[in-house]
Amino acid sequence: MPNLKSTPHLQATFLLLIAMLSLQSSGSLAKVLFDQFPILTVSAMRLLLGSIILAVLFKIWQVDFKQVKYKAILSYGFALAGMNLLFYLSIARLPLGIAVSFEFIGPLSVALFYAKQRFDFVWVGLAILGLVLLFPFDQAAQPLDPLGIAFALGAGACWALYIVAGQRPSGVSGNHTVCLGMFVGMLILMPLAVFSGLPTNVF
């Protein structure tokens, strides 16, 4: 019989693995799209399609918008928009593995800041060791674009803000928080994408 106390941790680990797989695979797909569409267009359309899918999946129309804490949603959406855009800008200038390694400094910093128990530091150390083992040193031997590194670090900072903002009470469920935050992120990026010629590049 499974240990009921461990079930949520197993589920969280499983969902985390899926999330990381989706993140990295979407980065690879995005690099292909950069040949046909501006980076702003790709980032904005990703958030647009994501917000529509989540709105239908989690029935966003059932949300009591009077209960929504909009400051929390705005900070979450801003972090999400910055994380997506800056990450895409970084992988346009850097190899994917190197960009991800720099970006991971953000969430690792959050984990280190909130670490309280001995095992918390052990897990952070193992994560850093994993990054070192997976780091593409052969690609790093070539000159790296400083602006690409800056974009990756900026994406990591937004990722850290995304984690912290996601812990703040938003007045709605976690699923609806993600949906509304993604919609806010789309609203932030879409005007910039339209200004850069989204309708022409998409349609």
Question: What function would you assign to each model-found segment?
Answer:
Residues 41, 48, 88-118, 155:
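Specific alpha-helical transmembrane segments that line the substrate/conduction pathway
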Residues 38-39, 95, 173-174:
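A helix-boundary/kink motif common to multi-pass secondary transporters
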Residues 1-41, 75-78, 82-86, 129, ...:
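Glycine-/small-residue-enriched transmembrane alpha-helix faces in small-molecule transporters
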Residues 67-69, 98-103, 113-134, 142-149:
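Loop-to-transmembrane alpha-helix entry segments
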Residues 54, 105, 119-138, 155, ...:
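Hydrophobic transmembrane alpha-helices of multi-pass small-molecule transport proteins
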Residues 62-69, 109-119, 164-176:
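Membrane-interface helix-boundary motifs at transmembrane edges
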Residues 58-99, 131-133, 202-203:
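Specific transmembrane alpha-helical segments of multi-pass solute transporters/efflux pumps
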